């Protein structure tokens, strides 16, 4: 179907567009972006007062299927993506079975073909069964369609194994994504180390458990002239290490999550399992460092680390609750509030962080409204305030500390490959 989006404020950093434009969609592609377009054969979307941008790309999504369908499925997770304005998500490999072989990728790819509501890319596992001991077959995974490789959920802690992974990643030209955590330093911890963990009597996780591993990854990447992407950066020290490495020419990129630059460890005073995540919520100083790193380019992308868990896994004692929260549906309004409304960055910068930059890092032909590109478009009402209620949640799980919160910035329309899949905030998808 042909669509004509009229009167939108279009923001497309790739083409330096930031103003009122019309967008014509034809045959699943962007046909034109011009000051005024007329086409009587197209369905008109009047976007007056709304902001249109390339669809968001999430580098870090846990869709849980195959193997953990009680938490999330590819169908429900990609419904949440649509609701949050994400048109492409990258599913992490900590499924059951892990994404460590072409056969296991094929299982996920079959489900994606049948049930996904957005574009889904797959992260292969760096090591077999994500056990951190023996490398997966990188060439096989790349040929099978893996977009990058990670053992996310845990890090590859053996130095020799990670060094071998870097060497093979250079050989196969595939990006490694690091869950930077030294479990010897974080062992048994449940929240950030500091006054609040002491006051609450909860076992701490030090900043060093993250930044020491970030330091190692960068040293290995530098020595082997390899690329590395650091997932879910949460500490001031990590930001400083990454900034220094970039100045030295190391091919390092990094992401931060909205919860890590929105909340501090003070949120854990509620003892709610929905404030427990890995990396943990950090101090005010860490949050400020993340925001500055997003502003100055030290951190390249915003990712959700959407991590659904069932009620019985979260509504328990804090020590026993699983790590992780959902994030696809709240990422944009949180980032808009903390980064744009505060005056720290402008909308063009935010679109870069959520769409163009993740696309570039992963080598995807996304994140742009260039004519000929896939018509993946998100249209937002920046002024609309709404409550993130349990009834609103499209994910199979509701583990979010933002449930019940007033948010600003509402996704009105989401196009995926030229198909209108969210209209006036309502999903237009059939049940799987």
Curated annotation (Swiss-Prot):
It holds the Pfam family Amidohydro_1. One of its GO terms (molecular function) is allantoinase activity. Binds 2 Zn(2+) ions per subunit. It is an enzyme of class 3 (hydrolase). Pathway: Pyrimidine metabolism; UMP biosynthesis via de novo pathway; (S)-dihydroorotate from bicarbonate: step 3/3. It catalyses: (S)-dihydroorotate + H2O = N-carbamoyl-L-aspartate + H(+). Substrate binds at residues 62-64, 94, 278, 309, 323-324. It comes from Elusimicrobium minutum (strain Pei191). One of its GO terms (biological process) is purine nucleobase catabolic process. Its EC number is 3.5.2.3. The keyword Glycoprotein does not apply. Belongs to the metallo-dependent hydrolases superfamily. DHOase family. Class I DHOase subfamily. InterPro entries: Amidohydro-rel, DHOase, DHOase/Allantoinase_Hydrolase, Dihydroorotase_CS, Metal-dep_hydrolase_composite, Metal_Hydrolase. The active site is at residue 305. PANTHER family: ALLANTOINASE (PTHR43668:SF2). Keywords: Hydrolase, Metal-binding, Pyrimidine biosynthesis, Zinc. CDD domains: DHOase_IIa (cd01317). The keyword Metal-binding applies. Zn(2+) 1 binds at residues 60, 62, 152, 305. Gene3D superfamilies: Metal-dependent hydrolases (3.20.20.140), Urease, subunit C, domain 1 (2.30.40.10). HAMAP family: PyrC_classI_B. GO terms for cellular component: cytoplasm. Catalyzes the reversible cyclization of carbamoyl aspartate to dihydroorotate. This is Dihydroorotase.
């Amino acid at each position: 179907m042909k669509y004509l989006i009229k009167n939108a404020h279009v923001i497309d950093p790739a083409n330096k567009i930031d103003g009122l434009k019309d967008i014509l969609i034809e045959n699943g592609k962007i046909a034109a972006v011009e000051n005024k377009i007329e086409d009587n054969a197209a369905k008109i979307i009047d976007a007056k007062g709304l902001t249109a941008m390339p669809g968001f790309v999430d580098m870090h999504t846990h869709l849980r299927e195959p193997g953990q369908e009680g938490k999330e499925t590819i169908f429900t997770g990609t419904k949440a993506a649509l609701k949050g304005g994400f048109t492409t998500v990258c599913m992490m490999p900590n499924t059951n079975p892990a994404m460590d072989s072409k056969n296991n990728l094929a299982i996920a790819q079959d489900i994606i073909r049948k049930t996904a509501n957005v574009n889904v890319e797959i992260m292969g596992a760096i090591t077999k069964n994500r056990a951190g001991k023996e490398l997966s077959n990188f060439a096989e995974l790349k040929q099978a369609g893996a977009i990058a490789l990670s053992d996310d959920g845990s890090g590859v802690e053996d130095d020799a194994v990670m060094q071998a992974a870097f060497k093979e990643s250079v050989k196969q030209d595939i990006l490694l994504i690091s869950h930077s955590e030294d479990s010897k330093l974080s062992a048994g911890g449940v929240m950030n180390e500091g006054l609040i963990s002491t006051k609450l009597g909860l076992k701490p996780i030090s900043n060093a458990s993250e930044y020491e591993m970030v330091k190692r990854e960068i040293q290995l990447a530098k020595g082997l002239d390899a690329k590395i992407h650091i997932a879910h950066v949460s500490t001031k020290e990590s930001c400083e290490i990454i900034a220094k490495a970039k100045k030295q020419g190391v091919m390092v990129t990094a992401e931060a999550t909205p919860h890590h630059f929105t909340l501090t460890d003070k949120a854990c005073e509620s003892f709610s399992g929905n404030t427990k995540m890995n990396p943990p919520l950090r101090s005010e100083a860490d949050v400020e460092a993340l925001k500055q790193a997003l502003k100055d380019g030290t951190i390249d992308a915003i990712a959700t680390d959407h991590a659904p868990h069932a009620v019985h896994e979260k509504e328990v004692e804090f020590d026993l609750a699983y790590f992780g929260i959902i994030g696809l549906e709240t990422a944009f309004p949180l980032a808009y509030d903390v980064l744009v409304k505060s005056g720290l960055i402008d909308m063009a910068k935010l679109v870069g962080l959520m769409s163009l930059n993740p696309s570039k890092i992963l080598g995807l032909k996304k994140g742009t409204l260039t004519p000929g590109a896939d018509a993946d478009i998100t249209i937002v009402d920046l002024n609309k305030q709404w409550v993130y209620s349990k009834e609103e949640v499209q994910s199979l799980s509701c583990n979010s500390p933002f449930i019940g919160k007033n948010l600003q910035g509402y996704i009105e329309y989401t196009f995926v490959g030229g198909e209108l899949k969210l209209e006036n905030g309502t999903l237009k998808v059939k049940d799987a």
